[in-house]
A protein has these predicted regions:
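Non-heme Fe(II) oxygenase catalytic core, chiefly the N-lobe of the double-stranded beta-helix
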Residues: 1-224, 229-258
């Protein structure tokens, strides 16, 4: 095992990165790490990228709070990769559990590498040169529809205009091809008609959640997950209302998908 509540040696950092490239998502139990060591763990993978819309841990603006309560239940339950509305989406995410419900609240992950490899060669070729648009506003449309929602997110909308990413990207470390569209932030594929774009995206959204491409993690107190945001998608399961769930997340800066 490994104790993440401390300073990692260079050999441990290298081992974690190699394991992440191989398995795409890593799970750890019994890691009661402080906010400082959460930050240091994330920094071992690269510079940190902040989120424009969520509350953060006091004294640690890098750590995003993801919280669901009876008064304010979580609204996001779609499959997605984190923050693909950015020109440089995060390369990885480090998420730790702080408060977990007695039952429910699991998270699902899907391998976009396996999903790509599960396509026919003809479909791989067809998708290879397509470009899709990702939009911050599309992912937060429920919040924007709330009273005062647009005013609260106005600055984030201005700072995050729609961006273009390849439908099929190349993983910069493994060289493998992955599907890089998601139902939360991807709005359409360029140079196709609206109906063509919708049909292709819906086909891909259905394909990527094929059970053979997925895994499921049951959170315990002080559990921690690290996932490769370039080659996976995930989905939180909101099946624990009205119970309380609080997670704390750090995203690590990535590159421009190609």
């Amino acid at each position: 095992g490994i104790d993440l509540n401390g300073v990692l040696e260079e050999s441990q950092k290298k081992a974690l990165r190699n394991l992440l490239n191989e398995h795409e998502v890593l799970f750890f139990r019994n890691q009661d790490i402080s906010p400082l060591h959460h930050k240091l763990l994330a920094l071992s993978f690269g510079p940190i990228q902040t989120h424009p819309a969520y509350e953060t841990v006091k004294g640690f603006p890098e750590i995003t709070i993801l919280e669901s309560t009876a008064k304010k239940p979580s609204k996001i339950e779609a499959w997605h990769s984190d923050m693909t509305f950015k020109k440089h989406p995060p390369m990885a995410t480090v998420l730790k559990s702080v408060i977990v419900p007695e039952r429910g609240g699991d998270t699902l992950w899907a391998s976009m590498t396996a999903a790509y490899e599960g396509l026919s060669s003809h479909m791989q070729t067809f998708l290879s040169d397509l470009i899709a648009v990702h939009d911050f506003s599309h992912g937060f449309k429920e919040t924007l529809a709330e009273p005062g929602g647009r005013e609260r997110l106005e600055d984030a909308i201005i700072m995050n205009p729609p961006v273009r990413h390849p439908v099929i990207r190349t993983h910069p470390e493994t060289g493998k091809k992955v599907i890089f569209v998601n139902s939360l932030f991807t709005t359409h594929i360029e140079d196709l008609t609206r109906s063509e774009s919708e049909e292709i995206l819906n086909l891909l959204f259905k394909h990527i959640i094929t059970p053979e491409f997925t895994c499921r993690f049951q959170w315990h107190p002080h559990s921690l997950a690290i996932w490769d945001n370039r080659s996976t998608q995930h989905k939180p399961i909101n099946d624990y209302f009205p119970n309380h769930r609080r997670m704390e997340r750090i995203t690590i800066d990535g590159d421009n998908p190609y």
